[in-house]
Amino acid sequence: MYSADPIIYVVHDFLSKDECEEFINIAKKIGQEDINIYRVNHDASNLLHETSKRLSILVQTPIRNAEKYLVTTFNEQTITTETIDSLNPETQSKLMEKDSGGQRLLSLMGALSEKDRLEVTFSELDLNIKLQTGEILVLHNCYEGSISPNPKSKYTIRATNKTVSWYLKLIFRERLIK
């Protein structure tokens, strides 16, 4: 565990080499969507369906509460900005409506490319976490037991090498996404 407020921990060797390659291959088949972000269904293949179930068990939240996987490519030159995945109830209430699953409670992140390392920086915590291929970082976006965003959950993610890196993110909502 790296932090208790917000809860941040890393699970080593969670994704197999085959699972990492499957995410990359399916994203490549989808083609370019939003510059370098590919939205991948939880059941895009039998292997990813099983991976989705394992991730759901890891965070003890139904996979039906999760948004689609975001598989992203970037390199050392990619300009990244500070991100907070939780939704602000005052300004983003439409995104929190019943059908959209409510608040974004958990974010899972991982490096997919062989020999890649991703660095996740939490500026509010003065914390840098380097993720290796197959590792999963789990971040609780809200205060414990609430849907109020924790401002300390802001992060920046970047590649630590010059080649194209593949990165995975999965966000779990508070309720079923319809």
Regions flagged by a language model, labelled:
Residues 1-137, 142-178:
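Fe(II)/2-oxoglutarate oxygenase catalytic core
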